[in-house]
């Protein structure tokens, strides 16, 4: 894990090494705890440019490699579950949402990435019962997974995101 205490700095260092190894034939970077992988060539300095470290620290979506974003269907449940894995490495909760279909993947990936980035940079904490504005009139309300949502269990805390409109915030 290296000597830096920041998980983000550790991941940035690993990404830089992966980029260097890609010129020697490395094919992919795997983040097992985040349930994700990316082609090693994504991290080549030529691909990222002269500000590669800043890009990896500040501009690279956390849900691309550092905290994975996974979509899956659960038997006998309509729709698609979308969730993050690996946020516990940063001391953050993972997020999950029950979407209508795979077409909502980018929306939820963006929401999760933005919220995780905010939590990481601000030091703020979120828990079940909290709400947060994620769009002009859209808020996310957080809850713990229900007992029958066993498939959302993970090594750390997972919070279920329910998107609500502004007028629903005070109705609950």
What residues fall within each predicted segment?
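Long, hydrophobic/aromatic-enriched structural stretches that serve as scaffold segments
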Residues: 1-4
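Short amphipathic alpha-helical segments
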Residues: 6-17, 104-111
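Acidic, low-complexity cytosolic segments
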Residues: 11-30
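Aromatic/basic-lined ligand-recognition segments
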Residues: 32-172
């Amino acid at each position: 894990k290296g000597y830096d205490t920041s998980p983000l700095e550790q991941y940035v260092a690993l990404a830089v090494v992966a980029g260097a190894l890609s010129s020697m034939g490395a094919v992919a970077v795997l983040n097992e705890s985040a349930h994700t992988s990316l082609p090693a060539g994504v991290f080549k300095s030529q691909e990222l440019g002269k500000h590669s470290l800043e890009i990896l620290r500040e501009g690279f979506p956390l849900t691309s490699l550092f905290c994975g974003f996974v979509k899956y269907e659960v038997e006998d449940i309509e729709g698609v579950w979308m969730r993050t894995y690996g946020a516990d490495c940063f001391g953050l909760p993972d997020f999950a949402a029950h979407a209508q279909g795979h077409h909502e993947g980018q929306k939820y990936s963006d929401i999760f990435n933005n919220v995780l980035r905010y939590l990481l940079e601000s030091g703020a904490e979120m828990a079940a019962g909290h709400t947060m504005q994620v769009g002009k009139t859209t808020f996310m309300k957080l809850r713990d997974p229900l007992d029958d949502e066993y498939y959302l269990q993970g090594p750390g805390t997972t919070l279920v995101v329910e998107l609500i409109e502004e007028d629903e915030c005070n109705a609950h």
